[in-house]
UniProtKB/Swiss-Prot annotation:
A Gene Ontology cellular-component term: cytoplasm
Gene3D superfamilies noted in UniProt: 3.30.1360.40, Ribosome-recycling factor (1.10.132.20)
Keywords of the record: Cytoplasm, Protein biosynthesis
Record-linked SUPFAM superfamilies: Ribosome recycling factor, RRF
Pfam families: RRF
GO molecular function: ribosomal large subunit binding
Subcellular location: Cytoplasm
Single GO BP term: translational termination
Name this protein carries in UniProt: Ribosome-recycling factor
InterPro entries, A to Z: Ribosome_recyc_fac, Ribosome_recyc_fac_dom, RRF_sf
Similarity comment text for this entry: Belongs to the RRF family.
Primary role: Responsible for the release of ribosomes from messenger RNA at the termination of protein biosynthesis. May increase the efficiency of translation by recycling ribosomes from one round of translation to another.
Endpoints of the signal sequence: none
UniProt gene name: frr
Amino acid sequence: MANVIIEKAKERMTQSHQSLAREFGGIRAGRANASLLDRVHVEYYGVETPLNQIASITIPEARVLLVTPFDKSSLKDIDRALNASDLGITPANDGSVIRLVIPALTEETRRDLAKEVKKVGENAKVAVRNIRRDAMDEAKKQEKAKEITEDELKTLEKDIQKVTDDAVKHIDDMTANKEKELLEV
């Protein structure tokens, strides 16, 4: 039963890591990255559709994204969605593909994005700590219900703390790497 609590906590913490990685992917670092467009949805035949399902996204150069629609008739819809998005990038439509040139980041913008990265990383750590609290509460409930002994509870609490420490360290590493990537010129 104790292993179930730890496995459940590990699984939820892994989901937090994946969520953080998705968040970081959406923060542009001055170079082209297809995940920048993950949050862009296009109204395609009356349905909000993720851009990557109706077009291929390639990176021909370090700071250029090339969006090639599978269906040429959707080009105007894609252009409209990209203009409406909060990416801060103006699409260039040449009639068959859309080019997105990622502008170089100013020093001030880099610092602002680094602050945003820290905030997102801190939110992920809070989520991990909440998962730890839930796991600890579950362990205490089991001890109260006499499903585990007091010694087993102490061991379980140590194991939960170790898993939490590992998860927080991983988040710190991810945050530091993203900050480093942002602050590189």
